[in-house]
Amino acid sequence: MMKSKIKWVLLSLQVLYIPISYSADSLDEIINSHQQEYEQLALKIWDLAEVGYQEYKSSDLLQQSLKNKGFRIETLPYMPTAFVAEYGKGSPVIAILGEFDALPGVSQSTSPFKEKYKNNIAGHACGHHLFGAGSAWSAVTIK
């Protein structure tokens, strides 16, 4: 159930950013070629459940993923877990926001029942684990 929900959310994020010039078949191929990687990345961020401004490991995972795909990464001195990933030069400029922070006090397993997860004190009640991974996946898809 969680895996199909992850795919649906990540794919719906991608629809917002995909150029119209691609055929449906080539888009499916591009999206599917990265599916497993970004589903796993979302689940890793879920497991880490780092609260805002302390999501160092989650930030590192996303940065490394984008760097491996040829993006230039710039970190920000005033917010150490935030970063800008750039690919290419010139126009058009497309900006994609990704969030990956967890919320304190909402630890939850991936089951539909109320089950605290690994005694974590934080959790992803708002789906930011999907938002962060989905935004990175979208950027990789449209580059």
Each predicted region: which residue ranges?
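Acidic/His- and Gly-rich active-site-bordering loop/insert found
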Residues: 24-124, 133-136, 141-142
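Bacterial N-terminal signal peptides
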Residues: 10-17
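Alpha-helical and His/Cys-centered functional microenvironments
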Residues: 18, 132
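Sec/Tat signal peptide C-region and signal peptidase I cleavage site
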Residues: 19-23
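Bacterial N-terminal signal peptides that target proteins for export
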Residues: 1-9
